[in-house]
């Protein structure tokens, strides 16, 4: 949704149309667009407390998952080289493959015909698996070959707190709806760059 030079965005995906909540998503996008068009402010470069909405987290997470590939791991070009079975995230975060989760639109098999099974990739922040193709799996004796088609990021509180609750407890910060054109700056340490999109707001005293 566009209002002047500002845009707003919201989305949902589910197998059941009754779970899409189209009116709620539409109103959320409209509110963001209108709010973004109201007295925009410019902030100087610096370090800020940042709250990422789920879509923004997903954009960054997709790059992390991409970098879990075994080939670059064994070549030493992965940001996770020599970090298997070590903590790479906050201990309150875990990453699972959950193909049966109703909200993830999972499938029973991959595009290569491999079975998709429930599996653990990061538990309590500790990386315990890599993404193998058939070649690296055979080379390193990986069987069965697990995949990460339906990633589910689980967070314990306060990581799992709702966005509205995070906003209320933030004295000064930035709320990011989404990212666009995310690109790697340095793949070896997973430094990324990108642009915020569809609603970036200043938070002061717990309010946008």
Q: What role is predicted for each listed range?
A:
Residues 1, 60-79, 117-118, 197-207:
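Short, Lys/Arg-enriched charge-dense amphipathic segments
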Residues 1-68, 72, 89, 128:
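Internal alpha/beta scaffold segment
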Residues 12-19, 67-77, 135-148:
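Extended active-site and interfacial segments that coordinate phosphate-rich ligands
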């Amino acid at each position: 949704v566009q209002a002047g030079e500002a845009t707003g965005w919201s989305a949902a995906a589910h197998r059941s149309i009754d779970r899409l909540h189209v009116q709620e998503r539409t109103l959320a996008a409209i509110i963001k667009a209108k709010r973004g068009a109201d007295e925009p402010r410019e902030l100087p470069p610096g370090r800020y407390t940042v709250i990422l909405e789920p879509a923004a987290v997903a954009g960054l997470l997709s790059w992390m998952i991409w970098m879990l590939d075994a080939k670059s791991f064994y070549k030493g070009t992965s940001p996770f080289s020599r970090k298997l079975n070590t903590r790479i995230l906050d201990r309150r975060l875990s990453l699972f493959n959950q193909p049966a989760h109703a909200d993830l639109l999972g499938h029973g098999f991959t595009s290569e015909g491999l079975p998709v099974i429930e599996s653990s990739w990061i538990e309590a922040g500790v990386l315990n698996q890599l993404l193998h193709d058939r070649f690296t799996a055979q080379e390193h004796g990986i069987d069965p070959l697990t995949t990460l088609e339906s990633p589910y990021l689980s967070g314990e509180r306060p990581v799992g707190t709702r966005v509205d609750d995070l906003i209320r407890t933030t004295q000064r910060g930035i709320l990011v709806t989404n990212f666009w054109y995310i690109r790697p700056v340095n793949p070896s340490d997973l430094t990324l760059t990108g642009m915020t999109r569809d609603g970036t707001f200043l938070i002061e005293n717990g309010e946008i």
